[in-house]
Amino acid sequence: MKTADPFSLPRRRFVQGLALGATGLGLGLTPGQLLARQGHTGAPTLSGDTFHLTLGGADVNITGKTRPATTINGIVPGPTLRWREGDTVTLKVTNMLPETSSIHWHGLLLPFEMDGVPGLSFDGIKPGETFTYRFPVKQSGTYWYHSHSGFQEQTGLYGSIIIDPKTPEPHAVDRDQVIVLSDWSDEDPKHIFATLKKLSHYYNFNERTVFDTLRDFRHKGVIQTLKDRHMWNTMRMSDRDLADVTGYTYTYLMNGQSPNGNWTCQFNPGERLRLRFINASAMTFFDIRIPGLDMTVIEMDGQPVKPVPFHEVRLGVAETLDVIVEPKADQAYTLFAQSIDRSGFARGTLTPNPAMSAPVPEMDPPPLLGHTEMGMGAMQHGDGHEGMDHGQMNHNMAGMKHSDHGNAVPFAVDPNNPDLPPRNNATDHAATEYGPGVDMRTMAPGEMLADPGIGLRDRDWKVLTYADLETAGGPPDSLHPEREIVLHLTGNMSRYMWSFNGIPFADAVPLELYHNERVRITLVNDTMMTHPIHLHGLWSDLEVGDGKLLRKHTVTVKPGEKLSYLVRADTLGRWAYHCHLLYHMDAGMFREVRVVEAPADGSHAHHGAHGEDA
């Protein structure tokens, strides 16, 4: 288990620190004070409407070993880009890497040609070429950008975006800090992926031991313990499969610094600080808290929410969260972000004095998955059909009512989306979900928006959940969809295969939406992994109950969970839709969504009046 690295400062950061220090000499500030006042991540902030970014390579030393990284303007993370809502930005991106690259502007509303996904938006940026992104800035808030080519995101191609609103900021603060969380490995990510394909549990060093078995004998009895072991062995799974890639190979970073690097933000007691958390990791869910200091959420995924005080939150991969903290005491506080599987943590410090630090909490014990607590009390497992008659599963559901929501819409087969298999209801399993690519199917998915998640349910303090939140100002769009699409999140952990509805991207056809239609997308997680699902170019308005919506760009779906969000297909083009766990996306949990004009003859009316399965 890896939780820290040597104290030596990599040359890259030493040189960067000299440059920042020189900038602040005329102000009479130390480099640390300059960083704190300007809200630096350790990378420079670039402001304006025209930017030049260079994608390249550099050697970095994060763990005591010098390893190659991909960089933006020579640094990891890349520079923070600060824009203003209503401006038009121009970004000239030059690729000095020996392979095709790209930049995707995560969560931004823009023309699809500017979205930065090779094969969908454009051809990518070839070595030695420059691509110019230009688009109007239609929103404000905290976002981020990253490569959408290969595994370059894992090796350092990511950075933060702050968009200032064109109207006065409703939350006045004294300091504004970006906090980028990420995961770094000295291994080549291609090797990591190849290892997962061969042995999916390779990086899990929290597996049960003989001592665990003996302890369970004492607590549960021999018979129940053996039954539990037999169940998990039959499923070819483990109750400790919380993360595919762990602290065995990962070092967890805060603003590019390892735990021993201890990224630090200085404040004056009594100040209001805005902390902009960005989970820019490839594979890691972080549980974030600041012992001794309350947080109040004001934005999620760049969108304002009704403020809610809390003490801890699980931030999914690719999500952002803006909070206000008001440290009044003359003391230091630890920013603590442990991985979901408790194999490591990122750490930083808020302090009134650079000489002061705070204790670092011990990590929690690794939590255990349970089929009941995950809503999987009635799971089917294995590649076979378990004696069920699936010949009746592939039938036309036209006219059948779907009653999972107050605004229910009927199901129908959609001729424009041929691989949307019909079902009796959202929890039924289509014929495509039986085969070598799917090793488990939930029969009783639950609504879990109020569930903090595995490892956080027994806290003595407030853990923030989706159910606590709603977009400020009320629903941002209609609550009434014209149709519903159902997607099951599927996979085979032992073979490291991931998909939607049992169909990997290589075999899937694009999902088609008509321009400006309102669609409900229902996700059912049939796997025992947590998945962050990201739809490019369009908002996902999560239905949190009582007519409330939470506007997001990335939605985390827990094991055995069923949730729904509403999408307004208001921008034409070809959009990516995928799990934001990098290796899951590469292993097949990816779809193309095409937003097209409706036929002029009105033949789409039937299509728009029915729901269907994806």
Regions found by a protein language model. Give the residues of each.
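Histidine-centered copper-binding motifs that mark active-site loops
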Residues: 2-9, 16-317, 323-324, 354-403, ...
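Short beta-strands and strand-coil junctions in structured, solvent-facing domains, enriched
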Residues: 99, 169, 186, 283-285, ...
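Short, aromatic- and glycine-rich surface loops/edge beta-strands on solvent-exposed regions
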Residues: 144-149, 332-340, 575-579
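Active-site pocket scaffolds in enzymes
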Residues: 62-64, 107, 113-122, 296-311, ...
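Short, surface-exposed loop/turn segments at beta-strand-coil junctions that are enriched for proline
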Residues: 136-140, 326-332, 568-574
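Conserved small-residue hotspots that stabilize compact domain segments
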Residues: 291, 295-296, 320, 324, ...
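N-terminal pre-domain segments of enzymes
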Residues: 38-47, 51, 419-423, 427-429, ...
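Generic recognition of flexible, low-complexity loop/linker segments
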Residues: 78-79, 261-264, 274-276, 284-285, ...
